[in-house]
């Protein structure tokens, strides 16, 4: 991922240095496991643990000759050791190291992403509570529907991100597993105890059955889950973009002193952060196809997935980490124009209370079809002539003979839409 959309904490996880360090840890743990089984002298393992070092430049230099990165790596590490070097990579195949270490690196990335998710969820919870009773216009098909509250909107985002967090925790169990089962997965030259020891000490699980590789349905599920999280962010970002339109202006991204919105138009204050999140989400989603096409490998292995994953996994995790952090800050610093929200409710001349009038008539004994046919024409006239809807309702004796002034007051009271907000918040776990 390009530096512009990267945070150092996450980018450092995907460096060659960290990858080789992960490989080395797998190799050393394998030696320790062999030692526990009495196959490698403990003194040799201690020397390997103490003296084995990674030198990325030297490993890459050797790779120019070997054309095999793991062979180059093991030879480079062996250069830092004495006679004990013969135990490095003992009984292992390359993918025992690569796939297990990759899962360990992904675990490191996942630790960061999980913290990102929790921080964002905390911000959403705070916003939901702060604006719990802040009335605003609810819109369906882009058209005014009925009042809701900005807090309910934030509660919706909160519960969606809670689901994303649960899905993420589930996929961690799928993706954070290792395999050290040999060339075709039969443990022909390495006992299962080695795999169990290594994975336990790395803090990851073990695949119950594998070939030379971990099966890539795990990685496809992982990428799809990250893409779904990114898509939720995009959904929220698009909402902010729409609510920041000049004609609506119910929220606005923070605009710093000295910030510029346009090279040509000095007045511009654009939702560029949310637009940025939208674009990043598209990039992340684009990798779903790659992840799924990596699943059908040939027989017990091929490496067609390898080149794709070297690009995909860093890009997706780095981009999502960046997006989560940036969008958390956007929401945290969001300006909310409560007066504009209330004013927008009044823009449609009271039409948004049409269902309240309809239900009131039904409750007084009128047949639904008759009530609907009385209310709808008034709504159409109000929309076309900009006449207050209530005024038209009050001019119809067939309605006023059924509904009293007090009952109409209740129909046109926007606070009615707050009646169940407490219940919604309780159900969302925000009480």
UniProtKB/Swiss-Prot annotation:
SUPFAM superfamilies: L-aspartase-like (SSF48557). Keywords: Lyase, Purine biosynthesis. Pfam families: ADSL_C (PF10397), Lyase_1 (PF00206). Its EC number is 4.3.2.2. CDD domains: Adenylsuccinate_lyase_1. One of its GO terms (molecular function) is N6-(1,2-dicarboxyethyl)AMP AMP-lyase (fumarate-forming) activity. PROSITE patterns: FUMARATE_LYASES (PS00163). GO terms for cellular component: cytosol. Pathway: Purine metabolism; AMP biosynthesis via de novo pathway; AMP from IMP: step 2/2; Purine metabolism; IMP biosynthesis via de novo pathway; 5-amino-1-(5-phospho-D-ribosyl)imidazole-4-carboxamide from 5-amino-1-(5-phospho-D-ribosyl)imidazole-4-carboxylate: step 2/2. The keyword Nucleotide-binding does not apply. PANTHER family: ADENYLOSUCCINATE LYASE. Belongs to the lyase 1 family. Adenylosuccinate lyase subfamily. This is Adenylosuccinate lyase.
